[in-house]
Amino acid sequence: MAPSQVEDISKTELETPEHCPGPESEQAGKEDACNGCPNQSICSSQLPQGPDPDLPLINKRLSQIDHKILVLSGKGGVGKSTFTSMLSWALAADEDIEVGAMDLDICGPSLPRMLGAEGESIHQSNSGWSPVYVADNLGLMSISFMLPDADSAVIWRGAKKNGLIKQFLKDVNWGEHLDYLVVDTPPGTSDEHLSVTTYMKEVGIDGALIVTTPQEVALLDVRKEIDFCRKANIKILGLVENMSGFVCPNCKGESQIFRPTTGGGKKLCEDLKLPYLGAVPLDPRIGKACDAGESFFDSYADSPASSAILDVVDALRDQIEISLEKLNI
């Protein structure tokens, strides 16, 4: 059973302004967004606060995790969550590797469906919140496990999202050791991104994996995501181009659905001097596997998309090792 403070969240009354800086911020009660908030006078009259007392707890929890990867995209619908699920399955294919997936797309959680964990719930113990395990070495945490049903909307503003993300990072017990934590985020650069990068900064993030599709309308927003990473001092581990051509499951022929009118993801990486991890073809069976909550690699191991994804995962792990070698120089 989920902790009492997160039960029935779909019925929680929302009183915080849309761009609330948060009661712990130096700008609490002073921003334009605070005007009209019933708590404005309380926030603005508080004495300056010291460091967040939860940060040491977050650092202690995350220090048990070797590698932390953010999966980002500028545009929605490019397959970011789909790729997060496949990355998680691929890493967990090695039984000696412990993997955790954290779904921070608070208003649109989809990992539980893709990883076959819909309808599950969180359990609490003395050591924290227990993730839902979809395999012996693959655990998942998502707000979806706290909702009354799958159709319940989460209509939260920034401060509430910030609070839940803090609880996920502070209270989820991944066990004594985790090799990889893969964090799925919503599209764009929103409260979720600011919160997770702020809280994880001290303990260290290996970097971000950015997902795009070939067409320029997606690359426009990817450039903004890259700019966000650079301003937030998040290393970009690389970019993967998803839905890069359509492979017919019957004849194996390939055609371009989303044409790379400006050169696609590879050209973008060349221009911005970023690692290009590879391209994954559009295969309708990926969607079928995600809807069924099954590993695409188990169901379609010989498909071109399966080989392409595994190549991207290998390239990603190489980038992580390169980063570690540079730190040790």
UniProtKB/Swiss-Prot annotation:
Molecular function in Gene Ontology: 4 iron, 4 sulfur cluster binding; ATP binding; ATP hydrolysis activity; ATP-dependent FeS chaperone activity; iron ion binding
Disulfide bridges in this chain: none
GO cellular component: cytosolic [4Fe-4S] assembly scaffold complex; nucleus
Cellular localisation: Cytoplasm; Nucleus
Keyword Cell division: no
Keywords assigned: 4Fe-4S, ATP-binding, Cytoplasm, Iron, Iron-sulfur, Metal-binding, Nucleotide-binding, Nucleus
One Pfam family this sequence matches: ParA
Residues given in the record as [4Fe-4S] cluster 2 binding sites: C248, C251
Cofactor: [4Fe-4S] cluster
Entry-linked Gene3D superfamilies: P-loop containing nucleotide triphosphate hydrolases
Residues binding ATP, per UniProt: G74, K75, G76, G77, V78, G79, K80, S81
Region annotation Disordered: where it falls in the sequence: 1-33
One GO term of the biological process aspect: iron-sulfur cluster assembly
Biased amino acid composition, Basic and acidic residues: 8-18
Role summary: Component of the cytosolic iron-sulfur (Fe/S) protein assembly (CIA) machinery. Required for maturation of extramitochondrial Fe-S proteins. The NBP35-CFD1 heterotetramer forms a Fe-S scaffold complex, mediating the de novo assembly of an Fe-S cluster and its transfer to target apoproteins. Required for biogenesis and export of both ribosomal subunits, which may reflect a role in assembly of the Fe/S clusters in RLI1, a protein which performs rRNA processing and ribosome export.
Protein name per its UniProtKB record: Cytosolic Fe-S cluster assembly factor NBP35
Species whose genome carries this gene: Debaryomyces hansenii (strain ATCC 36239 / CBS 767 / BCRC 21394 / JCM 1990 / NBRC 0083 / IGC 2968) (Yeast)
